[in-house]
Curated annotation (Swiss-Prot):
Monomer. Zn(2+) binds at C28, C209, H234, E238. It is found in: Cytoplasm. SUPFAM superfamilies: Anticodon-binding domain of a subclass of class I aminoacyl-tRNA synthetases (SSF47323), Nucleotidylyl transferase (SSF52374). A motif ('HIGH' region) lies at residues 30-40. GO terms for biological process: cysteinyl-tRNA aminoacylation. A motif ('KMSKS' region) lies at residues 266-270. One of its GO terms (cellular component) is cytosol. Keywords: Aminoacyl-tRNA synthetase, ATP-binding, Cytoplasm, Ligase, Metal-binding, Nucleotide-binding, Protein biosynthesis, Zinc. This is Cysteine--tRNA ligase.
């Protein structure tokens, strides 16, 4: 039975969908003004894993991940680049989809773009004003009145008094309360705007997700996910907006993945340790990055370093070596089989991927010890639940290096080494082996010939 850690309840809870057999899930996606970074990669991969496991468990899933395509940062970047907002956002949406595909992430069922839902956002703001949860200021902005929502702070576990005392909030004379947040921003010269009952303007960030979630999943749905950094204020504000407008529970299960740290420091541009997905994929195979992300529990902090990526590469190489050169039988997973049952128990326990990985490595050890093709096939099938180990082993082990020798060049050198050995020129053969080793190429001489892989 699946259990999920619910941020709202601060506990693991047995998952019980609103409609038996069906799951509605919304995940906050990217603001598309730049290339996706490692934090985005973690959100993509973690909730892809959740999506895969829910489907494997027999649920019919509707997975929505939004795209924020209007925002202060987007406007600033478009102006800085001298390009239109549409050109900027289209370019980075395409780049985001390329990055996600390389990481083995399945496309969500729906990817709504905020600018296509302005009508729904305006309608929700109108409802909030009618229900006295929001007010129009004299400057054309519309604000949510947080004091009107009695349970504001329930997701973050903070009272309004604590928030007022502890949060640094920009002073705005148009607000009735410093904690009130904007639902609609009055138009500024040179910025895109839409007509509304309060004059031309554009939506605030928080209302976008509330409106898109309700449009596609209804006012009450099963799972809402995102990075831990969104818990407050974004998700807190979503609850206030959605429950204020619709008068019912917004989401049953709130899931938040942990932060990315770089060499045990917070990842940030100011510290100079900020990496895009593309920068990381210049150095590491995309499956290694996916493996690295999933090896940690999704709620734990994830520490990025070259040491940890190298370790992930070695671990994944070990698993692929188990599959290499074997004729694997077609296998439908029997979840009553001991290793499969333990794997399922791990993922049913709040998606405990570290425990699931432990099962994979035990299977690899057993397959290597016994030579069992059935054990190796089960290893591949279970890893497939996580989007791993589905390539031809040689494709991974001999895969294109980010830099250095190509497979054709390696094969040529191996042939030269073989010729040198036949001529008993062992010094030349050793020189070629050493040169390949220096390039990270490991040779394995067998009676059937010489095979190779990247270290």
């Amino acid at each position: 039975m699946l259990k999920i850690y619910n941020t709202l309840a601060r506990a693991k809870q047995t998952f019980s969908p609103i409609i038996p057999g069906k799951v509605s899930m919304y995940v906050c996606g990217m603001t598309v003004y730049d290339y996706c970074h490692l934090g985005h990669a973690r959100v993509m991969v973690v909730f892809d894993m959740v999506n895969r496991w829910l489907r494997s468990s027999g649920y019919e899933v509707t997975y929505v991940r939004n795209i924020t395509d209007i925002d202060d940062k987007i406007i600033a970047r478009a102006n800085e680049n001298g390009e239109t907002i549409n050109a900027l956002t289209d370019r980075f949406i395409a780049a985001m989809n390329e990055d996600a595909a390389r990481l083995g992430v399945w496309r969500p069922d729906l990817e709504p773009r905020a600018t296509d839902y302005i009508h729904e956002m305006i309608a929700m703001i109108v409802a909030l004003i009618e229900k006295h949860h929001a007010y129009a200021a004299d400057n054309g902005d519309v604000y949510y009145a947080v004091s009107s929502f009695a349970s504001y702070g329930k997701l973050s576990g903070k009272s309004l008094e604590d928030l007022r005392a502890g949060e640094r909030v920009e002073v705005d004379a148009h607000k009735r309360d410093p904690m009130d947040f904007v639902l609609w921003k009055a138009a500024k010269p040179g910025e895109p705007s839409w007509d509304s009952p309060w004059g031309p303007g554009r939506p605030g960030w928080h209302i976008e997700c509330s409106a898109m979630g309700a449009r596609h999943l209804g006012p009450h749905f099963d799972i809402h996910g995102g990075g831990q950094d969104l818990q407050f204020p974004h998700h807190e504000n979503e609850i206030a907006q959605s429950e204020g407008a619709h008068g019912c529970t917004f989401v049953n299960y709130w899931m938040h993945n942990g932060f990315i740290r770089v060499d045990d420091e917070k990842m940030s541009k100011s510290l100079g340790n900020f990496f895009t997905i593309r920068e990381v994929l210049e150095k590491y195979d995309a499956e290694v990055v996916r493996f690295f992300i999933l090896r940690a529990h999704y709620r734990s902090p994830l520490n990025y370093s070259s040491h940890h990526l190298d370790d992930a590469k070695q671990a994944l190489t070990r698993l692929y070596n188990t599959l290499r050169g074997r004729e694997l039988p077609q296998l439908d997973i029997d979840w009553r089989q001991p290793e499969a049952e333990r794997f399922k128990q791990a993922l049913d326990d709040d998606f405990n991927t570290p425990e699931a990985f432990a099962v994979l490595f035990e299977l690899a050890s057993e397959a290597n010890r016994t030579g069992s093709a059935v054990q190796a096939a089960l290893l591949k099938a279970l890893a497939g639940q996580l989007g791993l180990l589905q390539r031809d082993p040689d494709e991974f082990l001999k895969g294109e290096a980010v830099a250095g020798l190509s497979p054709d060049e390696i094969e040529r050198l191996i042939a030269e080494r073989l010729a040198a050995r036949k001529c008993k020129n062992f010094a030349e053969a050793d020189r070629i082996r050493d040169a390949l080793t220096a390039q990270g190429i490991i040779l394995e001489d067998t009676p059937q010939g010489t095979s190779w892989r990247r270290s």
